[in-house]
């Protein structure tokens, strides 16, 4: 019993000692050391850093890299949100001035995004970087609010107006006022010149515009040298807010080659892209070309691609340890359909061709200057010569683009570093660039009259619709005069503006006698296709142009494509087209003629009102002009009563007055007559003139359909998309836009006619142009390897003995029996269609040469196997 009590006492004492020790330790941890832990916790923090994936590459069809991102270093500026005193602001400005000098001494340059610019007159002005007034006002507002300028009273009034273009910004700070305020706000030294001060303003402006993401640094210089990186790090103590970071820089290793296809990048992220997709305002994103259209695949900067690094930092902001790391996902690679070697050949061929034509035209102008002066009494400099052009090579069996050239070109690498004033001048503001628009892809965005290359479409349509047999023989009569029977059974003719055949003389019409469809294509006889178009009618001609894909976008994965037009009342002028305000839409008509007529009508109506000494009401004049134009529906009936009624209702001129002033009604009727489709316009459309306009890329798929006998493909320049491991993310398979089902006899006639165009034996219109290429002629023409068609669409004045302002077209497909490719060459102001023959020779020589080298008998045997 005693032993049990003793054991109990001993155990109790031990437990009490242990409990005491535990209580003491708990006291020490919570009370004594707690303050230390609390202090340590207060001196540490966590921060997360977004990690962006590398932008994907752009490759040609064989895997050759056309665009990639290389590792580089940037200089960044991060303003501590807690440091907002005047002293802090002055310190940041001093640091930026020093950093800018370091960067520039190291061969780099800082961002130049300030909205404040120095005009040619020496006065400060705003440049908002957007064209529309509404967009300018939106940026102006954001700028003022971000910079802390008080415009609240003005906004109260303006925000009641939905249309920002109508906002009154007259009380907002001028560029001069803003510049003065910002220099003072940021303590920019008074002796610092404008050019250097504005560099500081650019950086500080970006910080405030990015204020709601103030934790993100602003990149102030891209792709700087290692010397700059070392200097920034060495002087870190005096460069408050400055740091360097590893990044990537986009590189286009082939410079100007394929520039219009690849496009370029810019720091153009919108607020929506930043908030919804996770982009930073510093991110470079696609602005044009493949870089733009395939942005969602190429980018590594969106939320779904970005990774994250979570760091623990001490009170000085230095990282203590990494708490977590989520790797970023790189952007996908985009493989194109183009062959970069063929692309290079095509671009060189086009550039050489334009230079050759331009030289020939300049020589012709000098030789015939006297005749020009007599004919026009004008300055010879008014005539334009070849300066631009486009070329497309397409796989006729898939619709894939193998090469696409636009001249002149540009270097997309320039946009990465930011355009220098000299580069900006060269691309956008020089006399040459204004005339030639180097950054515009003319293969998809330029619409031009096709001229004679459209004749195959007219011929196929007429034969397929049964209004003309392919073997029917039609003889040229030089001038095509429309003959018809009126409602009273009387024979009538329309001789005004009668189109002529290209023979240029009635004495030569025997050369175009008894022509079949194939003959007419070979001879390029305007008369024949006027007859075909007249029988067919404009509606059917429009329909068939649509079937060939000439009046719609092709679907190519590039920005800026426009669609072609042929003709008809709705094309010339559509009186049913209305705008957002419910009235007739003039601006979005398919041709420019309605705009001209609208202005003329308003001028005429103003004269009517002023002749009566009445006050001119501009809104009433506008309404009246539009209502008058709505009368033009293509019907030829007399519209006099309706004209008088509308004038009376809108501008208060009684019908009794206009009844007496028949000259007034006649002048209105004459203007309305300008926007009425006429039979003479139908026949001109038949040989690719008049209102007919097409793009080179649409012509390429049209010629492809002629070659493959009826399959009109959607056009593609993207082959597939692959992730960073090489797995296919998206495959772009050939797709059919339309299938034309007609008899083989019609296709045979077209093929035969196009063969004849280049054949010396057949005396085709382009045959003589190949005389300077005897080897090519012997190897490829004499063996009937390809067929072609020239086009010389008139686009300018035509003085005596001077006829150079024509668009030069040459289209071809090859080989003729089993076609593989279609080629389109287009040179505005290019003299004549046959002028483009040198480029065709260069491209086909390369293409046929590559095919011959790839023939089985020419392949090299390795270890007994043929590769």
Question: Which residues fall in each region the model found?
Answer:
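Membrane-proximal periplasmic segments of bacterial cell-envelope enzymes
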Residues: 1-331, 335, 340-390, 396, ...
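Beta-lactam-recognizing serine transpeptidase/beta-lactamase-like catalytic domain environment
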Residues: 67-68, 73, 310-327, 338, ...
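A generic structural signal for short coil/turn motifs at secondary-structure boundaries
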Residues: 83-87, 358, 530, 797, ...
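Short conserved micro-motifs at the rims of enzyme active sites and ligand-binding pockets
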Residues: 271-274, 797-801, 824, 834-837
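Conserved helix-loop functional segments at active or binding sites
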Residues: 352-359, 674, 708, 756, ...
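Short, glycine/acidic-rich hinge or "gate" loops at secondary-structure transitions
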Residues: 361-372, 472-476, 539, 716, ...
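Short, gly/Ser/Thr-rich active-site loops of penicillin-recognizing serine hydrolases
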Residues: 727-735, 841-867
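Amphipathic oligomerization regions
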Residues: 828-847
């Amino acid at each position: 019993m005693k032993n049990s009590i003793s054991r109990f006492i001993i155990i109790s004492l031990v437990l009490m000692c242990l409990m005491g020790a535990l209580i003491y330790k708990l006291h020490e941890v919570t009370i004594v050391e707690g303050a230390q832990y609390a202090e340590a916790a207060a001196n540490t923090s966590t921060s997360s850093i977004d990690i962006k994936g590398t932008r994907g590459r752009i490759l040609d069809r064989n895997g050759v890299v056309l665009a990639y991102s290389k590792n580089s270093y940037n200089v960044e500026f991060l303003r501590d949100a807690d440091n907002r005193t005047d002293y802090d602001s002055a310190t940041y400005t001093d640091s930026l001035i020093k950093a800018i000098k370091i960067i520039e001494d190291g061969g780099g340059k800082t961002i130049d995004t300030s909205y404040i610019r120095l005009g040619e007159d020496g006065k400060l002005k705003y440049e908002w970087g957007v064209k529309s007034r509404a967009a300018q006002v939106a940026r102006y507002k954001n700028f003022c609010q971000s910079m802390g300028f008080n415009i609240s009273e003005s906004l109260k009034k303006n925000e009641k107006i939905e249309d920002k273009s109508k906002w009154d910004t007259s009380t907002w700070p001028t560029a001069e006022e803003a510049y003065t305020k910002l220099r003072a706000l940021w303590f920019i030294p008074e002796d610092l010149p404008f050019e250097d001060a504005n560099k500081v303003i650019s950086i500080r402006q970006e910080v405030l515009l990015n204020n709601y993401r103030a934790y993100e640094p602003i990149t102030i210089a891209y792709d700087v040298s290692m010397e700059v990186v070392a200097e920034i790090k060495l002087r870190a103590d005096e460069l408050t807010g400055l740091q360097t970071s590893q990044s990537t820089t986009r590189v286009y290793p082939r410079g100007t080659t394929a520039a219009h296809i690849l496009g370029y990048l810019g720091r153009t992220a919108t607020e929506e892209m930043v908030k919804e997709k996770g982009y930073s305002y510093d991110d470079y994103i696609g602005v044009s070309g493949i870089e733009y259209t395939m942005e969602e695949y190429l980018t590594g900067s969106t939320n779904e691609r970005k990774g994250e690094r979570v760091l623990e930092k001490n009170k000085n902001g230095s990282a203590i340890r990494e708490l977590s790391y989520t790797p970023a996902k790189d952007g996908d690679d985009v493989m194109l359909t183009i062959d970069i070697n063929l692309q290079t050949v095509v671009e060189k061929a086009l550039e050489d061709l334009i230079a050759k034509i331009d030289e020939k035209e300049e020589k012709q102008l000098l030789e015939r200057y006297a005749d020009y002066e007599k004919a026009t009494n004008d300055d010879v400099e008014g005539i334009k010569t070849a300066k631009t052009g486009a070329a497309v090579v397409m796989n006729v069996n898939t619709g894939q683009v193998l090469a696409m050239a636009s001249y002149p070109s540009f270097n997309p690498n320039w946009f990465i570093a930011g355009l220098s004033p000299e580069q900006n001048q060269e691309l956008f503001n020089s006399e040459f660039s204004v005339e030639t628009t180097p950054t515009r892809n003319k293969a998809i965005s330029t619409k031009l009259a096709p001229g004679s290359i459209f004749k195959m479409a007219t011929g196929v349509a007429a034969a397929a619709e049964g209004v003309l047999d392919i073997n029917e023989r039609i003889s040229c009569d030089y001038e095509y005069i429309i003959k018809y029977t009126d409602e009273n059974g009387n024979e009538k003719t329309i001789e005004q503006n009668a189109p002529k055949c290209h023979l240029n003389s009635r004495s030569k019409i025997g050369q175009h006698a008894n022509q079949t469809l194939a003959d007419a294509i070979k001879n390029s006889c305007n008369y024949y296709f006027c007859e075909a178009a007249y029988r067919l009618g404009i509606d059917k001609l429009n329909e068939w142009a649509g079937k060939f894909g000439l009046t719609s976008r092709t679907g190519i994965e590039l920005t800026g494509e426009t669609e072609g037009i042929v003709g008809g009342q709705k094309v010339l002028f559509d009186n049913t087209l209305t705008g957002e305000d419910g009235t007739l839409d003039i601006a979005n008509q398919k041709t420019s003629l309605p705009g001209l007529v609208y202005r003329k009508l308003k001028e005429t109506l103003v004269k009517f009102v002023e002749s009566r000494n009445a006050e001119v009401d501009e809104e009433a004049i506008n309404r009246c002009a539009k209502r008058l134009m709505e009368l033009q529906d293509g019907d030829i009936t007399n519209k006099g009563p309706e004209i008088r009624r509308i004038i009376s209702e809108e501008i208060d001129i009684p019908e009794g007055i206009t009844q007496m002033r028949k000259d007034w009604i006649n002048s209105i009727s004459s203007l309305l007559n300008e926007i009425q489709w006429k039979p003479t316009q139908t026949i001109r459309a038949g040989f690719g003139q008049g209102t007919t306009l097409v793009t080179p890329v649409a012509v390429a798929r049209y010629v492809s359909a002629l070659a493959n006998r009826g399959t009109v493909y959607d056009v593609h320049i993207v082959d597939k998309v692959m992730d960073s491991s090489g797995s296919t993310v998206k495959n772009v398979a050939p797709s059919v836009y339309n299938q034309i089902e007609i008899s083989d006899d019609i296709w045979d006639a077209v093929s035969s006619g196009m063969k004849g165009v280049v054949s010396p034996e057949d005396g085709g219109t382009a045959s003589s142009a190949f005389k300077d290429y005897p080897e090519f002629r012997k190897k490829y023409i004499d063996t009937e390897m390809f067929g072609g068609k020239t086009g010389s669409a008139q686009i300018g004045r035509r003085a005596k003995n001077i006829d150079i302002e024509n668009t030069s077209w040459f289209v071809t497909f090859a080989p003729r029996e089993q076609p593989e490719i279609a080629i389109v060459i287009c040179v505005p102001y290019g003299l004549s269609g046959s002028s483009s023959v040198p480029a065709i020779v260069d491209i086909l020589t390369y293409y046929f040469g590559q095919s011959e080298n790839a023939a089985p008998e020419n392949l090299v045997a390795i270890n007994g196997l043929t590769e």
